[in-house]
Swiss-Prot record:
InterPro entries: Nucleotide-bd_a/b_plait_sf, Ribosomal_uL23-like, Ribosomal_uL23/eL15/eS24_sf
The protein's role, per its UniProt record: One of the early assembly proteins it binds 23S rRNA. One of the proteins that surrounds the polypeptide exit tunnel on the outside of the ribosome. Forms the main docking site for trigger factor binding to the ribosome.
Gene that this sequence comes from: rplW
Keyword Lipoprotein in annotation: no
Molecular functions (GO terms): rRNA binding; structural constituent of ribosome
GO process annotations (BP): translation
Name of protein: Large ribosomal subunit protein uL23
Species in which this protein is naturally found: Frankia casuarinae (strain DSM 45818 / CECT 9043 / HFP020203 / CcI3)
UniProt entry keywords in alphabetical sequence: Ribonucleoprotein, Ribosomal protein, RNA-binding, rRNA-binding
Subunit structure, as described in the record: Part of the 50S ribosomal subunit. Contacts protein L29, and trigger factor when it is bound to the ribosome.
Pfam families for the chain: Ribosomal_L23
Origin: domain of life: Bacteria
GO cellular component: ribonucleoprotein complex; ribosome
Protein backbone atom coordinates (compact mmCIF):
# COMPACT_ATOMS: atom_id res chain seq x y z
CA UNK A 1 0.00 0.00 0.00
CA UNK A 2 1.27 3.46 -0.89
CA UNK A 3 0.99 5.66 2.23
CA UNK A 4 0.93 9.16 0.73
CA UNK A 5 -1.78 9.91 -1.88
CA UNK A 6 0.51 12.45 -3.55
CA UNK A 7 2.85 9.58 -4.45
CA UNK A 8 0.08 7.93 -6.50
CA UNK A 9 -0.89 10.90 -8.72
CA UNK A 10 2.23 12.10 -10.55
CA UNK A 11 0.88 14.85 -12.82
CA UNK A 12 -2.11 15.78 -15.00
CA UNK A 13 -2.05 14.98 -18.70
CA UNK A 14 -2.06 18.11 -20.86
CA UNK A 15 -3.35 17.15 -24.30
CA UNK A 16 -6.14 18.00 -26.69
CA UNK A 17 -7.99 14.80 -25.79
CA UNK A 18 -7.77 15.46 -22.04
CA UNK A 19 -9.11 19.00 -22.53
CA UNK A 20 -12.03 17.57 -24.51
CA UNK A 21 -12.84 15.15 -21.69
CA UNK A 22 -13.16 18.04 -19.22
CA UNK A 23 -16.60 18.78 -20.71
CA UNK A 24 -17.68 15.29 -19.58
CA UNK A 25 -16.20 15.89 -16.08
CA UNK A 26 -13.41 13.35 -16.73
CA UNK A 27 -9.86 14.23 -15.68
CA UNK A 28 -6.70 12.49 -16.91
CA UNK A 29 -3.63 11.90 -14.75
CA UNK A 30 -0.33 10.08 -15.10
CA UNK A 31 -0.08 7.74 -12.12
CA UNK A 32 2.42 5.27 -10.68
CA UNK A 33 2.60 2.10 -12.77
CA UNK A 34 1.97 -0.09 -9.71
CA UNK A 35 -1.07 1.88 -8.47
CA UNK A 36 -4.46 0.19 -8.69
CA UNK A 37 -7.88 1.78 -9.27
CA UNK A 38 -8.79 1.84 -5.58
CA UNK A 39 -5.57 3.66 -4.65
CA UNK A 40 -6.10 6.17 -7.48
CA UNK A 41 -9.69 6.83 -6.39
CA UNK A 42 -8.72 7.38 -2.75
CA UNK A 43 -5.80 9.62 -3.73
CA UNK A 44 -7.95 11.89 -5.94
CA UNK A 45 -10.64 12.12 -3.26
CA UNK A 46 -8.10 13.05 -0.56
CA UNK A 47 -6.02 15.49 -2.63
CA UNK A 48 -8.81 17.38 -4.41
CA UNK A 49 -11.73 16.82 -1.99
CA UNK A 50 -14.12 15.56 -4.69
CA UNK A 51 -16.34 12.47 -5.18
CA UNK A 52 -15.04 9.98 -7.74
CA UNK A 53 -17.58 7.90 -9.65
CA UNK A 54 -15.29 5.79 -11.85
CA UNK A 55 -11.61 5.21 -12.61
CA UNK A 56 -10.40 3.78 -15.92
CA UNK A 57 -6.71 3.03 -16.41
CA UNK A 58 -4.52 2.79 -19.50
CA UNK A 59 -1.10 1.11 -19.54
CA UNK A 60 1.03 2.70 -22.26
CA UNK A 61 4.00 0.78 -23.57
CA UNK A 62 7.22 2.78 -24.02
CA UNK A 63 8.16 3.52 -27.61
CA UNK A 64 11.39 2.33 -29.20
CA UNK A 65 13.26 5.39 -30.43
CA UNK A 66 16.38 5.87 -32.51
CA UNK A 67 19.15 7.98 -31.00
CA UNK A 68 22.57 9.07 -32.15
CA UNK A 69 24.10 6.12 -30.30
CA UNK A 70 21.66 3.38 -31.36
CA UNK A 71 18.23 2.38 -30.13
CA UNK A 72 16.64 3.51 -26.91
CA UNK A 73 13.28 3.30 -25.19
CA UNK A 74 10.89 5.84 -23.79
CA UNK A 75 9.64 4.71 -20.42
CA UNK A 76 6.25 3.04 -20.10
CA UNK A 77 3.54 4.96 -18.25
CA UNK A 78 0.11 4.48 -16.75
CA UNK A 79 -2.76 6.93 -17.18
CA UNK A 80 -5.93 7.19 -15.15
CA UNK A 81 -9.20 8.63 -16.46
CA UNK A 82 -11.10 9.80 -13.37
CA UNK A 83 -14.84 10.53 -13.66
CA UNK A 84 -16.18 12.91 -11.01
CA UNK A 85 -19.67 13.26 -9.58
CA UNK A 86 -21.86 15.97 -11.15
CA UNK A 87 -21.08 19.36 -9.65
CA UNK A 88 -17.51 18.46 -8.61
CA UNK A 89 -14.57 20.00 -10.47
CA UNK A 90 -10.80 20.09 -10.10
CA UNK A 91 -9.08 23.45 -10.57
CA UNK A 92 -5.89 22.21 -12.25
CA UNK A 93 -6.50 23.28 -15.83
CA UNK A 94 -7.66 26.63 -17.12
CA UNK A 95 -10.13 24.81 -19.34
CA UNK A 96 -13.93 24.72 -19.51
CA UNK A 97 -14.25 22.23 -16.65
CA UNK A 98 -12.39 24.49 -14.22
Amino acid sequence: MIPDPRDVILRPVVSEKSYGLLDENVYTFIVRPDANKTQIKLAVQQIFNVRVLRVNTINRQGKRKRTKHGWGHRSASKRALVSLAPGDTIEIFGGPGA
